[in-house]
From Swiss-Prot:
This is 5'/3'-nucleotidase SurE. Its cofactor is a divalent metal cation. The keyword Cytoplasm applies. PANTHER family: 5'-NUCLEOTIDASE SURE, 5'_3'-NUCLEOTIDASE SURE.
Amino acid sequence: MRILLSNDDGVHAPGIQTLAKALRKFADVQVVAPDRNRSGASNSLTLESSLRTFTFDNGDIAVQMGTPTDCVYLGVNALMRPRPDIVVSGINAGPNLGDDVIYSGTVAAAMEGRHLGFPALAVSLNGYQHYDTAAAVTCALLRGLSREPLRTGRILNVNVPDLPLAQIKGIRVTRCGSRHPADKVIPQEDPRGNTLYWIGPPGDKYDAGLDTDFAAVDEGYVSVTPLHVDLTAHSAHDVVSDWLDSVGVGTQW
């Protein structure tokens, strides 16, 4: 199995390095990751400047100022030959649950892999300690995919409780929960009297029902949520069509 491994925490982050070490025991792994933390970069792609890369002695590649999406795009189309069999993103430091997936560079890297035609996993740890647990879970999933490919055309967003492996209760297929909108902004003043602003933490849980990713992780289960790139709200199609007809948009300007 050939694996392209990326993340949004940066090439030296403990999550990606722990996972790379575990994966290399049974797979051919190429790390292509940002040279610094790009958390929250979502699906951004660098279009107005060139991208430089640096290859470390162990073969890992850092993309200077690159986003997670840049890294997967370059990895698939230029840096990994032959091309990978699968794209894996993570292990993220902290969860990507519910609405987090909108902003997550970890999830975005997996989405880019799926967009380019490859199976893809995004893996996050609900904390900052037991990366070995998340690595073991990821290896188990990848061995399963090697034995029997999952032909859903979807990304698997995997969130792992920050627990020793022996304390993981099992695995659940979940849906994304949701949070209350985040509204906290933290102002500061620099030495010259200018106001600076920091974006605050995410909102509290709003929808954390039993079938959500929030609930699974809180209860000690690995959460696996299938995600797709198509953002079309198919169930709203007829409602929007009827509304356009009722307000006359398209018949008069």
